[in-house]
Amino acid sequence: MRTLWIMAVCLIGVEGNFFQFAEMIVKMTGKEAVHSYAIYGCYCGWGGQGKPQDATDRCCFVHDCCYGTVNDCNPKMATYSYSFENGDIVCGDNNLCLKTVCECDRAAAICLGQNVNTYDKNYENYAISHCTEESEQC
């Protein structure tokens, strides 16, 4: 069910920041974003519950928390401006909400890149039913 939901979001959210975030992930990790992170652990992908399974999953947990602080726009559909400069992601929007969304995505992509060595194929396509431990607070 989670796979179908993510596929639907991919098709519906073509104009949203999904592809912007995916591009950041590819640049920072060298991994294909959808295949590697769309259904990973308890937090990478749509929604999340339980305890993050590893450092990679924790990056996604923190990203979810960051999105929770965004006001005045939908972070999953907001389109922002950014660039890649000298190996870094630079968010360039003057709109505070869009800049915040970009900074959330930037921080998560950097985190995933810094923790690419913790990536565990056992958490790919991880069933949310395994995420039963009490969720941490943001």
From Swiss-Prot:
Q: What is its EC number?
A: 3.1.1.4
Compartment(s) where it occurs, according to its Swiss-Prot or TrEMBL record: Secreted
For this protein, the record's CDD domains field holds: PLA2c
Question: How is the cofactor bound here?
Answer: Binds 1 Ca(2+) ion.
Q: Which cofactor does it need?
A: Ca(2+)
Task: Tell me which tissues or organs this protein is expressed in.
Answer: Expressed by the venom gland.
Q: Where is the active site?
A: 63, 105
UniProt keyword Transferase, yes or no? no
Reaction(s) catalysed by this chain, per the record, are: a 1,2-diacyl-sn-glycero-3-phosphocholine + H2O = a 1-acyl-sn-glycero-3-phosphocholine + a fatty acid + H(+)
Q: Which residues form each disulfide bond in the chain?
A: 42-131, 44-60, 59-111, 65-138, 66-104, 73-97, 91-102
Q: Name one GO molecular function term.
A: calcium ion binding
Q: Name one GO biological process term.
A: phospholipid metabolic process
Instruction: Give the PROSITE patterns listed for this entry.
Output: PA2_ASP, PA2_HIS
Instruction: Give the residues the record marks as binding Ca(2+).
Output: 43, 45, 47, 64
Highest taxon in the source lineage = Eukaryota
A Pfam family recorded for this sequence:
Phospholip_A2_1
Instruction: Tell me the first and last residues of the signal peptide.
Output: 1-16
Keywords, A to Z, come to: Calcium, Disulfide bond, Hydrolase, Lipid degradation, Lipid metabolism, Metal-binding, Myotoxin, Neurotoxin, Phospholipase A2 inhibitor, Presynaptic neurotoxin, Secreted, Signal, Toxin
UniProt cross-references to Gene3D superfamilies, sorted A to Z = Phospholipase A2 domain (1.20.90.10)
Described by its record, this protein's role is as follows: Heterodimer (A and B chains): phospholipase A2 that acts as a presynaptic neurotoxin and shows a PLA2 activity of 1377 umol/min/mg. In vivo, induces edema and produces neurotoxic symptoms in mice. Also exhibits indirect hemolysis, a strong myonecrotic activity and cytotoxicity. PLA2 catalyzes the calcium-dependent hydrolysis of the 2-acyl groups in 3-sn-phosphoglycerides.
What more does the entry say?
Negative results: does not provoke hemorrhage.
Give the family, as the similarity comment puts it: Belongs to the phospholipase A2 family. Group II subfamily. D49 sub-subfamily.
**Name the UniProt record assigns to this protein:** Acidic phospholipase A2 daboiatoxin A chain
- Originating organism: Daboia siamensis
